[in-house]
């Protein structure tokens, strides 16, 4: 995937088909609860936020240059239809806000793009957005068997706070409940800044949240 960069941005309506496809692939058995219609409803809900990571080929790979647009244009038309066919969504994350808590709905990455730091960057973007919305803590559920994800969450300050028995309808697996301490605390913010800097140093091809 040489010559390729990945950019994190807010999800738009035009991303829904690709995100639903990733959801189905990443969460078989659960994806029916987040259909394309459900994503449309989520994007209409002011308490829910989604971001996506998309793959962008450079001019050498694509053979053409993207038309540059001034910053004011991008702000004004932040939900414009994205006609740039080079934007191939490779991952997404979403959360909902409720009384000072940002609860992560899902973080999913296409099979061919895992272990590239994209999922971690989506988690970073999620925490960034939660801080912007003045959340106090971030929470989530994760499969009891998904140790890789649990280790990533622990790296970012999540701790095990409980267990939901037979939470996943597809196979009856338990869910581990994880939560951060206050993301507004100086201790968390210092650690988070360092983790973000380390990730940016290792993965220069992944550009943080824009727009």
Predicted regions and their residues:
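Acetyl-CoA-dependent GNAT
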Residues: 2-6, 10-112, 123-125, 129-133, ...
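A short beta-turn/loop motif at secondary-structure boundaries
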Residues: 41-43, 96, 145, 167-171
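Intrinsically disordered, low-complexity acidic/polar segments
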Residues: 62, 116, 149, 187-188
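Residue-level recognition of the GNAT/N-acetyltransferase active site
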Residues: 110, 114, 143-145, 170
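Conserved acetyl-CoA-binding loop-helix of GNAT-fold acetyltransferases
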Residues: 115-128, 147, 151-155
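Short coil/turn segments at alpha/beta junctions that flank glycine-rich nucleotide-binding fingerprints
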Residues: 116, 133-136
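Conserved catalytic-core motifs of GNAT/GCN5-like acyltransferases
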Residues: 139-141, 154, 159-176, 189, ...
């Amino acid at each position: 995937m040489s010559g390729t960069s990945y950019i994190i941005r807010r999800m738009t309506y035009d991303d829904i088909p690709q995100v639903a496809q990733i959801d189905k692939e990443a969460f078989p058995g659960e994806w029916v609860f987040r259909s394309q219609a459900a994503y449309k409803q989520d994007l209409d809900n002011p308490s829910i936020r989604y971001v996506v990571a998309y793959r962008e080929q450079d001019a050498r790979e694509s053979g053409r240059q993207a038309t540059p647009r001034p910053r004011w244009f991008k702000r004004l038309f932040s939900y414009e239809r994205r006609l740039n066919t080079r934007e191939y969504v490779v991952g997404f994350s979403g959360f909902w806000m409720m009384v000072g808590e940002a609860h992560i709905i899902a973080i999913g990455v296409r099979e061919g793009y895992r272990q590239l730091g994209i999922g971690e960057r989506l988690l970073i973007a999620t925490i960034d957005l939660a801080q912007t919305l003045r959340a106090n803590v971030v929470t989530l559920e994760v499969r009891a068997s998904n140790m890789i994800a649990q280790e990533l969450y622990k790296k970012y300050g999540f701790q095990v706070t409980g267990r939901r028995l037979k939470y996943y309808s597809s196979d009856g697996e338990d869910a581990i409940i994880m939560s951060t301490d206050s993301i507004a605390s100086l201790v968390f913010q210092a650690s988070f800044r360092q983790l973000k800097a380390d990730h940016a140093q290792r993965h220069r091809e992944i550009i943080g949240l824009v727009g």
